[in-house]
Amino acid sequence: MVKIAWDPIYAHPLPEGHRFPMLKYELIPEQLLHEGIITEDNLFSPGPVAEEIILRSHAKAYWKQLRDLTLPAKEQRRIGFPLSPQLLERELRIAQGTIDGALFAREFGIAFNVAGGTHHAGSNWGEGFCMLNDQAIAANYLLSAGLHRKILIIDLDVHQGNGTAEIFYNEPNVFTFSMHGEKNFPFRKERSDLDIGLEDGIEDAAFLKILEDTLPELLKFKPDFIFYLAGVDVLNSDKLGKLALSKAACKERDRMVLQFCKDHDLPVQVSMGGGYSPNIKDIVDAHCNTFKVGIDIFD
């Protein structure tokens, strides 16, 4: 059975007018249930991740400031969310949801987190709505537990996974691949194992051809587990993305990646990442397509 990490705490209350579309974390499971794509049995509520697991990916001083709610105001502004006990609890549960999802993927082939994809969080900083890097934390958990030896992170959010790249810069057992808008945030990029910077305005056929040509190359690393970050800020409707992908192409992107995982018998954990279209229905539809494609391929 496909398992999906979700908890009501994911939809964290934000000040009125905040630009982050937090409502999507309520609407995604709601829509999947309404359409009969999933049942309540597919959903699980993760607990908070343990401190010792966080510290395999994040610096002790940074974690202590988060834990004690003493992160300087300037650093909180860089993250984009006002720090609070409830926000911290949310982040801890999202990270554990990705760990649990990775363990479920070992059993069922695929698992999802309705949130996560917090790839801008580096070892000692947070930014861009990211505090703790869920897929980095989960990858280091799998390595330290001896469950996997070669982990591939496929990051197709429109923004480079700079935090993920920094965390694993000197880790030979994790291969980081980021395909992103070259001129988009973050403006000072880190070095992934493979970065493909896309020009503004790239359309469906060109984007999908680059991905099709690149996926087989990733097998040279000989991964035995994959984390996939399926951001939908690549859509032509996205107000931050600057690319020109249709909803159909975004869905085809997901199908290509997840079929690749299935064809090569590679378990995959999927986190949702970003999406900033003005109409929240576009965001939710595109995210739900990721679930539909994955469930169709693996279930």
Question: What residue ranges belong to the model's regions?
Answer:
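Metal-dependent C-N hydrolase catalytic cores
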Residues: V2-A136
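A general "terminal functional-core" signal
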Residues: A73-D299
